[in-house]
Amino acid sequence: MFKREEIIEMANKDFEKAWIETKDLIKAKKINESYPRIKPVFGKTHPVNDTIENLRQAYLRMGFEEYINPVIVDERDIYKQFGPEAMAVLDRCFYLAGLPRPDVGLSDEKISQIEKLGIKVSEHKESLQKILHGYKKGTLDGDDLVLEISNALEISSEMGLKILEDVFPEFKDLTAVSSKLTLRSHMTSGWFLTVSDLMNKKPLPFKLFSIDRCFRREQKEDKSHLMTYHSASCAIAGEGVDINDGKAIAEGLLSQFGFTNFKFIPDEKKSKYYTPETQTEVYAYHPKLKEWLEVATFGVYSPVALSKYGIDVPVMNLGLGVERLAMISGNFADVREMVYPQFYEHKLNDRNVASMVKLDKVPVMDEIYDLTKELIESCVKNKDLKSPCELAIEKTFSFGKTKKNVKINIFEKEEGKNLLGPSILNEIYVYDGNVIGIPESFDGVKEEFKDFLEKGKSEGVATGIRYIDALCFKITSKLEEAFVSNTTEFKVKVPIVRSLSDINLKIDDIALKQIMSKNKVIDVRGPVFLNVEVKIE
Ligand code: ATP
């Protein structure tokens, strides 16, 4: 905490001095917790749900009222709506199926099988029979069967499961049997039911919308088709409603998403639930795929289908594919990857990789950590001392009553060289998925590498870690280790850097995996010629 009064007094006396000196009160974060190794964490929404939300608001702005339609539709309704074409539509529907409930009796043979397992059946026979009967009748759920059998026979549930498996094989190898119920393949199946019921309850005209899931038994999923998708559908019922309402609604919706590039094309499909010549497809342009994508279909329901549902006014329906719209808005080339990114490759960008390059060893104690800063500054200042030469840094640490004098000696004995090698100021960058050490200046860099390194510096993400920074942390963490183990001297010698570990750096496994699988590189080569001798007294 700041000593506020002292600071204010200092500032009153000499503002400039106080302003500069109080700078040290703002403690910098330690290197592994510094930017870009820290990254803001925020939640992320799904593009499909975002589009659904935007479409809901768009419909509401246009005066529509929200409804939820039945998801499960009896095939009879499809016949009612499509007439002779129903089979073609049902072909794209999923039917709901379930496992049959076998009629299993408690024969003498079964009783003796249970008794062979060491269980007395006689006094429990009746309750066991009741359970089997209840299951057949549907009063007992399948997932309660084992528990109920175990309770009836007063045995453990493990034994109950064994009996089910060994004595009642009828429950195994059951094959699902289809019902006449289907999962809706488009919202229309539900609109007929909803509009029909509202006819006597709601004054005309009315404008309804629903954004919900539909299911299609597509032969195969592809870049614009999924087995399950969302339809943002609406129905307008009332005298005078016609195809022009469809065009206006399509424009109203799409223009709220910023689309100006769309076209209406009469649908070749000519579904029997639409009035002839009203079924129209809406296409929007996908800039990345460079093709027109069908995003919606609209039409006026046929008076034949409407009459069967007791509806005696025109109803215009428009069904817009949410995923298709999300694909175009978010510039996704494949609906499968957009909806289920978790099943596809996840690429870390350079910013992500930069947050994963960290110092391997960093001293824990503040005094030793702070010495690193001093060490780095001295090394940078004296890096070009002509050899033979040495740079000595001395420091005394107090731990309770004990004092430790530390002498760090950085030296170069060979004649005619510099104290430190030329790559000492190289900084680690992440560029195009590569982790690279980039020199301060490009003088003397081979022509073939220049372009790549220059681009790395201007377009890549800087980690803010130079070789000398990481190496000095290596020296000070070794010093900390020496204190703990009572070692009195040690040496650090790094002539040429070849890998991250040579300069006390590490990288997260997921970044490393990506670098390897994408044929990217970690190139931190370079001569640093660091020789250090440390003595502790
Ligand atoms: P397509 O010709 O592209 O297969 P469709 O003519 O069968 O589509 P409609 O029955 O008119 O589609 O459905 C209305 C809208 O629902 C389509 O314009 C489309 O945006 C969307 N849609 C239909 N089927 C799928 C699907 N399998 N996956 C994603 N969206 C779909």
Swiss-Prot record:
Keyword Calcium part of the UniProt annotation: no
E.C. no: 6.1.1.27
One BP term from GO: translation
Gene3D superfamilies: 6.10.250.3340, 6.20.250.20, Bira Bifunctional Protein, Domain 2 (3.30.930.10)
One Pfam family cited in the UniProt record for this chain: tRNA-synt_2d
InterPro entries hit by this protein: aa-tRNA-synth_II, aa-tRNA-synth_II/BPL/LPL, O-Pseryl-tRNA(Cys)_ligase, Phenylalanyl-tRNA_Synthase, SepRS_C
Keywords: Aminoacyl-tRNA synthetase, ATP-binding, Ligase, Nucleotide-binding, Protein biosynthesis
Self-association and partners: Homotetramer. Interacts with SepCysS.
Function field: Catalyzes the attachment of O-phosphoserine (Sep) to tRNA(Cys).
Protein name (Swiss-Prot/TrEMBL): O-phosphoserine--tRNA(Cys) ligase
Native species: Methanococcus maripaludis (strain DSM 14266 / JCM 13030 / NBRC 101832 / S2 / LL)
Lineage of the organism: Archaea, Methanobacteriati, Methanobacteriota, Methanomada group, Methanococci
